[in-house]
């Protein structure tokens, strides 16, 4: 069996209290971006969920540095995958004794950072 050289690290954030559509706006923005640039963009982003994405990205960078010994200056975000998680269903009372259902969506986020060669 051939031992493959692992030059990527991952991190995940599960059950984030935001819809996957809103989370994917931020995830698509940072895909294929250098980690240093993505951290700056997430710090000053007006989106509420950007703080959670930044924490997940910092976790992936820490995994790359501590577990694999990768150079953090050459890390690039290769994957930022957003998935649906559970849906909390709530009831909202309405007029004339009726009620409607409110769905509160949750999402999962998976980030992969890879060390790229300088060219």
From Swiss-Prot:
Key words, A-Z: Ribonucleoprotein, Ribosomal protein, RNA-binding, rRNA-binding
GO biological process, one term: translation
Pfam families tied to this protein: Ribosomal_L22
Gene3D superfamilies xrefs: Ribosomal protein L22/L17
Reported function: This protein binds specifically to 23S rRNA; its binding is stimulated by other ribosomal proteins, e.g. L4, L17, and L20. It is important during the early stages of 50S assembly. It makes multiple contacts with different domains of the 23S rRNA in the assembled 50S subunit and ribosome. The globular domain of the protein is located near the polypeptide exit tunnel on the outside of the subunit, while an extended beta-hairpin is found that lines the wall of the exit tunnel in the center of the 70S ribosome.
Family classification: Belongs to the universal ribosomal protein uL22 family.
This protein's name: Large ribosomal subunit protein uL22
Species assigned in the record: Rickettsia peacockii (strain Rustic)
